């Protein structure tokens, strides 16, 4: 029995939810999202909450029950409040620039890396003296935000000896000891 799937999802005042065929549409102050529902999952929309039920109790539907409840919850939270991911560049000479939602990274390669971000993601670059450069990504779509942040991080993952690279804020990198002298 899914514990997460049984919790109803509350709908805030400014968010509108509509179900048509097997697609759920969520519209809020920050944007619009939709999700296709597969499997034998029922979505019941009441006045101010959404209840996710499953028709059959087989293994696949038990797994999808909690998944769709959390996807709907994250969609509602996203169009109402939004999500934020922070990355930091650690390394000498590592820089980032924001040119109208185009991220220009100088991270130790012989050339700059240019990433064009989707329209639903807003970009902010903080560069302060004597501090690491921060890249702040904001969006109402949690899935897309996570994919883009992971793609940026994968360009220069933190290396285990000095910790240089791109990492999430508050990410702990396990450091290895170097070679020991005889």
Swiss-Prot record:
Keyword line: Ribonucleoprotein, Ribosomal protein, RNA-binding, rRNA-binding
GO-annotated biological processes: cytoplasmic translation
Superkingdom of origin: Bacteria
Single GO molecular function: structural constituent of ribosome
Family matches, as InterPro entries: Ribosomal_uL6-like (IPR000702), Ribosomal_uL6-like_a/b-dom_sf (IPR036789), Ribosomal_uL6_a/b-dom (IPR020040), Ribosomal_uL6_bac-type (IPR019906), Ribosomal_uL6_CS (IPR002358)
Assembly behavior: Part of the 50S ribosomal subunit.
Family listed: Belongs to the universal ribosomal protein uL6 family.
Identification of the protein by name: Large ribosomal subunit protein uL6
Organism placement in taxonomy: Bacteria, Pseudomonadati, Bacteroidota, Flavobacteriia, Flavobacteriales
Primary gene name: rplF
């Amino acid at each position: 029995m899914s514990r997460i799937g049984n919790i109803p999802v509350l709908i805030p005042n400014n968010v509108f939810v509509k179900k048509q065929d097997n697609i759920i549409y969520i519209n809020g102050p920050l944007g619009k999202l939709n999700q296709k529902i597969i499997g034998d999952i029922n979505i019941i929309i009441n006045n101010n909450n959404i209840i996710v039920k499953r028709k059959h109790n087989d293994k696949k539907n038990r797994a999808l029950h909690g998944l769709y409840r959390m996807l709907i919850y994250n969609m509602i939270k996203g169009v109402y409040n939004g999500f934020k991911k922070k990355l930091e560049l650690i390394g000498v000479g590592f820089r980032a620039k924001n040119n109208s939602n185009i991220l220009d990274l100088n991270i130790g390669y012989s050339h700059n890396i240019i990433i064009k971000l989707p329209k639903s993601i807003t970009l902010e670059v903080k560069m302060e003296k004597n501090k690491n450069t921060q890249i702040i990504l904001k969006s109402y779509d949690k899935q897309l935000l996570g994919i883009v942040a992971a793609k940026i991080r994968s360009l220069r993952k933190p290396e285990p000896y000095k910790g240089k690279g791109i990492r999430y804020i508050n990410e702990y990198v396990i450091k290895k000891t170097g070679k020991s002298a005889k």
